[in-house]
């Protein structure tokens, strides 16, 4: 009986250990499950009960989806389960893609056929940018090769019938509930809670309903014509027109006219009490009429305009302009999220939004480096004076008096423990300001509870979230829909690559065989030290060294990523390269990065997970990954983004950037690697598997002898379980440093003999090494 209990305990430990290794760093701590109120329709799924399934599990839609006579000219298949398939080779692909990005979530976008999925949140986003229920169903019917299933029509109506019909608008610093549907306003006013929120005059009577005519015209003027995606009126030549059904072509002509024309809408509104806004929002959600927040910044006379404009040199690319038109489509500022690939110019989108609103702006990033980069971006693209920009980080606390643009980090605002006197004064100032725009960089990294704390500390009329990867390994990404707003725009990575807006990257997975000694220990050890064994695999080290030598001879700029600090230091020191990790000071970080950018002698740097986001290194064109965080899809995409910026002078080659992921064969790392690649594969990237690096035997590389490999193994075995853990970045949300944890240890650890290894060295060799000056210090420029 005792033996069985022991086996059960070992199984539980193994499962727990596996869970901890796979776990994502963005997860909230236990007990943070409090959810924002969401409409019940948001939980609905498309009904698939009538779909036939054959003996192999394949779905048979032939009876439900008869083809139209001219189906070859139409680009869409709409399946009864909500999945939509788009032919990328269709002459009307541009039109159909613009529409699908607005109403559905991209699932997979390879070369020829793209897959999308209708969800409640994607339909909410469609309504928020002005599409009506009838528009969505009519567009789908005209684009589809078959009839649109009745279940899909019902699902669209269910999700869009009430969303977007009621708006919360701030005008002249007074809040109004506004709708173009008078019957909806009357329905809301019948509710006692909403009647209580309505503003009353001095006599205690409710204020009158206000009827006005609202002219909607985009606040972003079209400056780019016919250049790949800014308008639906481009991209179809005369020959292709003959292949398009007449009803489809006429419909698109009408779409273009509707987009260009000013639209007059009659609205009905009533004023509400400012102190009851939160209660009003919750009640409207319960009534299935969630409020859509809009900021009428042009008519906000109480908040002063700031002196900021785009410089004449700032030219928006078509996709950047398109994303901003979604945000400012009706002359007001909508809150929401814009998704653009790393290196595609998210910062310029944020700066342009601030220049359009022209009210006080708060920018939040996730590190002190990103704060410095945002300041540089504002000075590069806008006419803002340096004295108008205020930074608030642990290292830099500028005086906020008279500033118009404040830049800080999430951890600085979400900090709950005692602050210094100076920091407390700045926080008080941030809290008392009424911000016109809040820009939230890398918005996917913020857990819901932390986010809610940041949102309650500062008040902003409009919130713009920017990210490259709207994915998380938990389900908390949907919280952003109601904490910030719907997704306004998402770009196609492959399309931007083909148009030259981002680099063309060759992705490769390099398989490194485990040396016999290392693999023997890997199989025997059951603690977290296994991670250290497959990361410090001598063959992986040799592959990394070979790739660095190969690309340095080509004058490439190389970044090597390692999540494990022990491995990071070992690799960097052995290869004589500079490295950046958590404890590296801000000054030293900037010095290393500046040398990497401008010093021709520094072509390789090692970075821990602190460099996953917000490190702006446009010169880098080679990335080597030696260790990573489990199966995180987000981290893989963020790291690829470090080399995605468009490269100058490298157009002749087929590929002008390289992404290598080094994986130890026959270990857990291979399973993690497959999981990590899912997001990039869905974006259209393919990974080349390299089992042998040509020319590696001819190079002089480290750990080429059994003795050297044995010494490395002894060093790894002498390391603690703490060394095997990943770096915990200060201020990173989701870090579990505050929780109790259990680690396996030995008696030698308790006696202080943890790092002791018996090794012999020749005395004369030691004396010679003391006189040697490290060449790295000669190469660095101060």
Swiss-Prot record:
The modification Phosphoserine is found at residues 34, 686, 751. This is General transcription and DNA repair factor IIH helicase/translocase subunit XPB. Component of the 7-subunit TFIIH core complex composed of XPB/ERCC3, XPD/ERCC2, GTF2H1, GTF2H2, GTF2H3, GTF2H4 and GTF2H5, which is active in NER. The core complex associates with the 3-subunit CDK-activating kinase (CAK) module composed of CCNH/cyclin H, CDK7 and MNAT1 to form the 10-subunit holoenzyme (holo-TFIIH) active in transcription. Interacts with PUF60. Interacts with ATF7IP. Interacts with KAT2A; leading to KAT2A recruitment to promoters and acetylation of histones. Phosphorylation on Ser-751 by CK2 controls the 5'-excision activity of ERCC1-XPF endonuclease; phosphorylated protein inhibits the excision activity and thus NER. ATPase activity is stimulated by TFIIH subunit p52 (GTF2H4). DNA translocase activity by this subunit in TFIIH is stimulated by XPA, ERCC5/XPG and XFP plus ERCC1. It is found in: Nucleus. Residues 1-11 have a biased composition (Basic and acidic residues). It comes from Rattus norvegicus (Rat). Residues 1-52 are annotated as: Disordered. Residues 20-30 have a biased composition (Acidic residues). A motif (Nuclear localization signal) lies at residues 6-18. SMART domains: DEXDc, HELICc. A motif (DEVH box) lies at residues 442-445. It catalyses: Couples ATP hydrolysis with the unwinding of duplex DNA by translocating in the 3'-5' direction; ATP + H2O = ADP + phosphate + H(+). Residues 543-703 form the Helicase C-terminal domain. The lineage of its organism: Eukaryota, Metazoa, Chordata, Craniata, Vertebrata.
């Amino acid at each position: 009986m005792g033996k069985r209990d022991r086996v059960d305990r070992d199984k539980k430990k193994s499962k727990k250990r596996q869970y901890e290794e796979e776990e994502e760093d963005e997860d909230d701590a236990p007990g943070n499950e409090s959810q924002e109120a969401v409409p019940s329709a948001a939980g609905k799924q498309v009904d698939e009960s009538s779909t036939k399934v054959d003996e192999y599990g394949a779905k048979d839609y032939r009876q439900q989806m008869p083809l139209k006579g001219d189906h070859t000219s139409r680009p869409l298949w709409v399946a009864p389960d909500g999945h939509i398939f788009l032919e990328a080779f269709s002459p009307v692909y541009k039109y159909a893609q613009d529409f699908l990005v607005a109403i559905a979530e991209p699932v997979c976008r390879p070369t020829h056929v793209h897959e999308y999925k209708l969800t409640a949140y994607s339909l909410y986003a469609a309504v928020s940018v002005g599409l009506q229920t009838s528009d969505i169903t009519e567009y789908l019917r005209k684009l589809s090769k078959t009839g649109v299933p009745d279940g899909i029509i019902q699902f669209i109506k269910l999700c869009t019938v009430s969303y977007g019909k009621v708006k919360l608008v701030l005008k002249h610093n007074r809040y109004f509930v506004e709708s173009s549907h008078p019957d909806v306003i009357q329905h809301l006013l019948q509710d006692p809670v909403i009647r209580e929120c309505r503003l009353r005059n001095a006599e205690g009577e409710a204020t009158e309903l206000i009827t006005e005519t609202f002219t909607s015209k985009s606040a972003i003027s079209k400056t780019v014509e016919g250049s790949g995606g800014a308008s639906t009126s481009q991209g179809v030549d005369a020959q292709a027109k003959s292949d398009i059904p007449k009803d489809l072509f006429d419909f698109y002509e009408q779409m273009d006219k509707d987009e260009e024309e000013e639209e007059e809408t009659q609205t009905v509104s009533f004023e509400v009490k400012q102190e009851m806004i939160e209660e009003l929002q919750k009640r409207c959600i319960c009534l299935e009429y969630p409020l859509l927040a809009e900021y009428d910044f042009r008519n906000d006379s109480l908040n002063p305009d700031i002196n900021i404009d785009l410089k004449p040199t700032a030219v928006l690319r078509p996709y950047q302009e398109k994303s901003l038109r979604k945000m400012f489509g009706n002359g007001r500022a909508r809150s929401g999220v814009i998704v653009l690939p790393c290196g595609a110019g998210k910062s310029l989108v944020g700066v342009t939004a601030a220049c359009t609103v022209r009210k006080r702006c708060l920018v939040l990033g996730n590190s002190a480096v990103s704060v410095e980069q945002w300041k540089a971006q504002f000075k590069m693209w806008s006419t803002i004076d340096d004295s108008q920009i205020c930074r608030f980080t642990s290292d830099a606390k500028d005086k906020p008096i008279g500033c118009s643009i404040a830049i800080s980090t999430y951890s600085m605002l979400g900090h709950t423990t005692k602050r210094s006197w100076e920091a407390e004064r700045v926080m008080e100032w941030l809290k008392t300001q009424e911000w016109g725009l809040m820009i939230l960089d890398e918005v996917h990294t913020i857990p819901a509870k932390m986010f809610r704390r940041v949102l309650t500390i500062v008040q902003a009329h409009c919130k713009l979230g920017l990210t490259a990867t709207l994915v998380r390994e938990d389900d908390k990404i949907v919280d952003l829909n109601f904490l910030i707003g719907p997704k306004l725009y998402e770009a196609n990575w492959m399309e931007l690559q083909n148009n030259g807006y981002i680099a063309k990257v060759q992705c490769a997975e390099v398989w490194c065989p485990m040396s016999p000694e290392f693999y023997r220990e890997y199989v025997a050890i059951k603690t977290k030290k296994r991670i250290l064994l497959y990361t410090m695999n001598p063959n992986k080290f040799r592959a990394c060294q070979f790739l660095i030598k190969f690309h340095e001879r080509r004058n490439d700029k190389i970044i090597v990523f390692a999540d494990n600090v022990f491995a990071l230091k070992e690799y960097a020191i052995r290869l004589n390269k500079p490295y950046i990790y958590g404890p590296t000071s801000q000054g030293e970080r900037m010095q290393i990065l500046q040398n990497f950018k401008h010093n021709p002698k520094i072509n390789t740097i090692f970075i821990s997970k602190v460099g996953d986001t917000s490190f702006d290194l446009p010169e880098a064109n080679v990335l080597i990954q030696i260790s990573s965080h489990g199966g995180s899809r987000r981290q893989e995409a963020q790291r690829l983004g470090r080399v995605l910026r468009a490269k100058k002078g490298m157009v002749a080659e087929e590929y002008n950037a390289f992404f290598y992921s080094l994986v130890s064969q026959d270990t857990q790392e291979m399973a993690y690697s497959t999981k990590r690649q899912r997001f990039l594969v869905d974006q259209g990237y393919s990974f080349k598997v390299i089992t042998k690096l040509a020319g590696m035997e001819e190079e002089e590389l480290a750990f080429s002898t059994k003795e050297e490999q044995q010494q490395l193994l002894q060093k790894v075995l002498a390391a603690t379980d703490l060394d095997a853990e990943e770096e915990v970045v200060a201020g990173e949300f989701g870090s579990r440093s505050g929780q109790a944890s259990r680690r396996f240890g030995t008696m030698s650890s308790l006696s202080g003999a943890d790092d002791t290894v018996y090794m012999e060295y020749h005395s004369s060799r030691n004396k010679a090494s003391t006189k040697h000056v490290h060449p790295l210090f000669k190469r660095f420029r101060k």
